[in-house]
Amino acid sequence: MKPGIHPEYREVVFQDIGADFSFLTRSTIAAKETIKWTDGKEYPLVKIEVSSQSHPFYTGKQKILDTAGRVEKFRQKYGM
């Protein structure tokens, strides 16, 4: 591999803000925030809206996931 062209692959905490669920994995995603994990170390934190803990396919519960107000934007745009 060429040096200096690959992103840093490191441990990152992903936090599902809707389900209050966090998990530690490895990723190259950039993060601005950090969080102290259960092992006492600081890790970059990435907040996500949907994970396996909140997605209807995995939970078996049907619910509307409209965190960005998409329905309201559509209604305003088309006068509904």
Swiss-Prot record:
Gene Ontology CC, one term: ribosome
UniProt keyword annotations, A-Z: Ribonucleoprotein, Ribosomal protein
SUPFAM superfamilies recorded: L28p-like
Alphabetized GO MF terms: structural constituent of ribosome
One GO biological process term: translation
InterPro entries assigned to the protein according to its UniProt record, in alphabetical order: Ribosomal_bL28/bL31-like_sf (IPR034704), Ribosomal_bL31 (IPR002150), Ribosomal_bL31_B (IPR027493), Ribosomal_bL31_sf (IPR042105)
Assembly mode: Part of the 50S ribosomal subunit.
Similarity section: Belongs to the bacterial ribosomal protein bL31 family. Type B subfamily.
Protein name stated in the entry: Large ribosomal subunit protein bL31B
Organism for this UniProt entry: Methylobacillus flagellatus (strain ATCC 51484 / DSM 6875 / VKM B-1610 / KT)
Encoding gene, per UniProt annotation: rpmE2
